[in-house]
């Protein structure tokens, strides 16, 4: 049960990584958006559990985009009162398609990322052995936001987070 809860919460946290991938229509714009990821982003989020009070958490995400804008490596460290995460994520960007893999180091969880670019950001599916969650991402130059809703709301109803770089 703990792994299931941690898997669901971690899937939500992974969404933060995708926040920095701003929407783009042309290849040149995509390179600029991916290059803009580089650096440290920090912010706050809230987990709304299936029952009980919401929990706030702090998060720092560092992005390492490739020069050609087709790959992004992300390091994620987040901490709340009851949750702590340390993860790495690798994304591939091919036109409007996003694929990738993630690994959470504390709880030994792994999974895949798949999704598509939309006009405002992304709709992404996070998959793992213990969860599946749909994520809606909206991004601007200095601020990133994400809403994650698990397919099964047994442990969590929603996660919402905001990060800033500027």
Locations of regions flagged by a protein language model:
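Central antiparallel beta-sheet cores of small beta-barrel/beta-sandwich binding domains
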Residues: 27-138, 147-166
